[in-house]
């Protein structure tokens, strides 16, 4: 019975709290700040693997993230614990990405609803990764990598694995 309850709790958590991986093409460590556009409190080092963060809230394209960051692709998967802020940890949306789990066709909508008009985009744009912009209920607004298209997708269709695709 405990396993069923735990699974149910995790399923709800996964649908309402999205995750994203860090893709910072600057060639330098990624800054984590104490507020949107605030003081840098930690730098996330470059790695051969990837980092996955939990997105908590957004303010002016800055995402507040959970203080535990999952590290993938190293010899052993590990966790990086952020330190140095009493006001939370913030990272800019432009270095956060995720993919689409399953078939990407008709996933993006003009409005945050299954009844919203499906957006017809080239599949290659959807495979290049999406940047998170805002959350409304169980929907997340995203921007394509080329910054030319935005749309809404269900949070449960997020693939936040930086090393593989999600079924």
Regions picked out by a protein language model, each given a short descriptive name:
Residues 9-14:
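N-terminal signal peptide c-region/cleavage motif recognized by signal peptidases
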Residues 140:
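Surface-exposed aromatic
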Residues 24-62, 99-137:
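Beta-loop motif signature
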Residues 15-19, 37, 66-115, 143-167:
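Boundary regions of SH3-family modules and the immediately adjacent low-complexity/disordered segments
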Residues 1-7:
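Sec-dependent signal peptide recognition
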Residues 5, 16-18, 49-51:
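Residue-level detector of functional hotspots within protein domains
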Residues 7-8, 98:
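Phenylalanine-focused residue identity feature
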């Amino acid at each position: 019975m405990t396993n069923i309850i735990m699974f149910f709790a995790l399923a709800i958590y996964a649908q309402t709290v999205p995750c994203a991986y860090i893709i910072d093409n600057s060639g330098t460590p990624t800054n984590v700040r104490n507020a949107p556009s605030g003081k840098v409190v930690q730098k996330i080092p470059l790695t051969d693997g990837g980092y996955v963060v939990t997105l908590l809230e957004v303010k002016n394209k800055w995402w507040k993230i959970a203080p535990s960051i999952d590290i993938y692709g190293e010899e052993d998967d590990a966790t990086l614990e952020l330190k140095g802020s009493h006001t939370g940890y913030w990272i800019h949306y432009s270095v956060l990405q995720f993919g689409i789990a399953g078939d990407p066709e008709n996933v993006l909508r003009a409005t945050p609803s299954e009844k919203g008009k499906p957006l017809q985009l080239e599949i290659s744009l959807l495979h290049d990764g999406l940047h998170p912009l805002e959350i409304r209920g169980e929907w997340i607004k995203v921007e394509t990598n080329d910054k030319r298209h935005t749309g809404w997708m269900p949070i449960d269709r997020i693939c936040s694995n930086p090393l593989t695709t999600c079924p």
